[in-house]
Amino acid sequence: MSIKSDRWIRHMAQQHGMIAPFEPGQIKQNATGQRIVSYGTSSYGYDVRCSREFKIFTNINSTIVDPKQFDNGSFIDVESDVCIIPPNSFALARTIEYFRIPRNVLVICLGKSTYARCGIIVNVTPLEPEWEGHVTLEFSNTTPLPARIYANEGVAQMLFLQADPDDVCQTSYRDRNGKYQGQTGVTLPRT
């Protein structure tokens, strides 16, 4: 597998709809000229933004977190330009961008250093071959203080790995009817 460059990312987004909406360059300021956490195409990746849709984890129901029987009541829904994550807690969000991953590509998501240096960790599982949808993002606040996440700004970087032509997967995410195929909002655990 080889990592793909900005040239390849632009081609796949603009000619094949791999990322929508798509920003071919790096955006570092908003419309009023204020500096923001950058998003868009980088040298070997794509920096995604999160939408204004957040689910903030709370333990008001004193529940046990169980991925097989997840209690939706464990989250507070928030729609805002800023999400404040409680200390030592987490929040879910989704990307603004919708992805359509080709059969010969695997995408790895890494957090942006701006957030990592503040103790905010981004966790996303790989975007598998032929998966499509908005990416559900998990932000962990590892600090003992509240932490902010900004909507419509960069939050994570996607790295695109392309398989050699003779080594394309036999079974894609679409082939096996993956449970998160086509997700459009912040998606909670499914079994």
UniProtKB/Swiss-Prot annotation:
Catalyzes the deamination of dCTP to dUTP. DCTP binds at K112, S113, T114, Y115, A116, R117, T136, L137, E138, Q157, Y173, Q183. The lineage of its organism: Bacteria, Pseudomonadati, Pseudomonadota, Gammaproteobacteria, Lysobacterales. InterPro entries: dCTP_deaminase, dUTPase-like_sf, dUTPase_trimeric. Belongs to the dCTP deaminase family. Pathway: Pyrimidine metabolism; dUMP biosynthesis; dUMP from dCTP (dUTP route): step 1/2. Keywords: Hydrolase, Nucleotide metabolism, Nucleotide-binding. The active site is at E138. It catalyses: dCTP + H2O + H(+) = dUTP + NH4(+). Disulfide bonds: none annotated. One of its GO terms (molecular function) is nucleotide binding. Homotrimer. Its EC number is 3.5.4.13. This is dCTP deaminase. One of its GO terms (biological process) is nucleobase-containing small molecule interconversion.
